[in-house]
């Protein structure tokens, strides 16, 4: 499988159907989901279907940036699955209206196993994805959203150069969201 990119400690590659059990295990951790919301799917088949839908939308779509999609994050030395990153047109986000996203904006997101927290993996991978996305003509800004209480996530955004750009009310969430942006 083609590798999207490597950083000093990470290898990012497109998610494959073989990653479905890894995603299910990641989403089974209530602490991982505490500030994120519901899991991507509720069954192994649901995760497989989620991954399969990424290919026509991002990975096999000639009109899509080669950077867009959901990427498995693996430790380079060991190959251990740590979590994932997403990079996609911001208009693909389910709360696009509430987040005030616009055409040309690219959303970055990430989700990691607890064992990978606090080690700089999210920052390392996100910085590289942000750097590469800003090189594309179609990108006007990098955007991201987190619940205000999720300081670990907002610190990653800040380390990538994004700045807080306002509060967001997300349907179904008791906590307030915050929008971050890095204009090109």
Name what the model sees in each region.
Residues 111, 124, 152:
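Short alpha-helical segment within the catalytic ATP-binding CA
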Residues 160:
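Structured interaction and signal-relay segments at domain junctions
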């Amino acid at each position: 499988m083609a590798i999207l990119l490597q950083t000093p400690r990470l290898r990012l590659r497109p998610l494959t159907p073989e990653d479905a059990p890894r995603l299910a295990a990641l989403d089974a951790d209530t602490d991982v989901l505490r500030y994120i919301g519901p899991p991507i799917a509720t069954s192994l088949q649901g995760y497989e279907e989620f991954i399969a839908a990424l290919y026509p939308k991002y990975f096999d779509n000639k009109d899509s940036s080669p950077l867009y999609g959901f990427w498995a994050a693996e430790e380079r030395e060991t190959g251990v699955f740590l979590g994932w990153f997403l990079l996609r047109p911001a208009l693909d986000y389910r709360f696009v209206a509430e987040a005030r996203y616009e055409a040309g904006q690219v959303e970055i997101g990430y989700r990691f196993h607890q064992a990978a927290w606090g080690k700089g993996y999210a920052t390392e991978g996100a910085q590289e994805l942000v750097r590469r996305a800003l090189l594309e003509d179609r990108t006007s800004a990098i955007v991201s959203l987190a619940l205000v209480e999720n300081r670990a996530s907002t610190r990653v955004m800040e380390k990538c150069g994004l700045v807080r750009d306002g509060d967001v009310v997300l349907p179904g969430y008791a906590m307030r969201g915050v929008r971050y942006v890095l204009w090109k």
